[in-house]
Amino acid sequence: NSGMINSILGIPRVMTEA
C-alpha cells in the first residue's frame, strides 16, 4: 500500500486502499 505517498499528495489513504 502506498499510504505514505498518498498522504504526501494530500489524498486520504482510505480512498486509495478502499
From Swiss-Prot:
Keywords: Amidation, Hormone, Neurotransmitter, Secreted. The modification Alanine amide is found at A18. InterPro entries: Pigment_DH (IPR009396). It is found in: Secreted. Pfam families: Pigment_DH. GO terms for biological process: chemical synaptic transmission; response to light stimulus. Transmembrane segments: none annotated. Disulfide bonds: none annotated. One of its GO terms (cellular component) is synapse. GO terms for molecular function: hormone activity. It comes from the Eukaryota. Belongs to the arthropod PDH family. Causes the migration of the distal retinal pigment into the proximal end of the pigment chromatophore cells and thus decreases the amount of light entering the retinulas. May also function as a neurotransmitter and/or neuromodulator. This is Pigment-dispersing hormone. It comes from Pandalus borealis (Northern red shrimp). The lineage of its organism: Eukaryota, Metazoa, Ecdysozoa, Arthropoda, Crustacea.
